[in-house]
């Protein structure tokens, strides 16, 4: 087997501003897995300010995987190839690239979309949310107006960056009463601030508040003190978080989970606690978004997923198969990942 790796740097159309800082560009690793006349494609999308994973670490891991995979023939089962890579270097963001390539290859060999390999009765389309960053009131309201006009049924607003009450009010006024409003603090608040802010903002009609604070113990306390639903994102990385029944919902990401297989396993753990699952990207490229759509379809998610993010990247043409229509992305119909 031959693993080919290409690294590119992509700039954001406008810098990504959240409570953890401003990011102007991201590294993306595209991989091709060659063997048996079929090429599987995948990607690794580390975002160090968010996940703490340096691009250099991913590059090193992928180089080791490439060297390792040369020793395997094309008829070796995919799970054994992935296990071998994991044994060499267990770095989820790098493993995700191999996992995606293996699923893409399997789908192409079977002539079926990945979602169909995972589940016969998968969703045909996955609900997605629009995301509004740390814009001022006028900018946030304008973005909300565009999102509502485009048919999004859910909008996520980044908070914890100042003037939250004014921005939330402006966005709700622009959206009207029927579009769900989700807030994401990226852990910017402490417990007391989170409780105070959530209670103050709740009259705007909140679907849920994502990652109001960091850490299982802190999230548990906030959830116990507010009526609004609370979800975790970054805290999902904390040991034991997925089984702690600490939140009403958990946001899972392809890269952080090590690919589709890892994400499905983690989703099962979360659902066993009674919590909901939804997916989001870390500003992934087209292959990462496609993989997440297939996984979300197989999971039959109800909550809108944060996968409408390709438009934030300069130089990336959104594939027709991944275009957002009326707040949903249809499952790509082509074999494999379908893009």
Residue ranges and their predicted role:
Residues 146-158:
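Catalytic domains of carbohydrate-active enzymes, especially glycoside hydrolases
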Residues 31, 37, 98, 111, ...:
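Conserved, mostly hydrophobic/aromatic
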Residues 157, 162-290, 317, 324:
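Catalytic core of soluble alpha/beta enzymes
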Residues 1-10, 17-24, 31, 82, ...:
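N-terminal amphipathic alpha-helix/helix-capping segment at the start of soluble metabolic enzymes
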Residues 1-12, 23, 28, 283-339:
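Flexible C-terminal active-site loop/helix
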Residues 109-134, 167-178:
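N-terminal small/glycine-rich loop or linker at the start of catalytic domains
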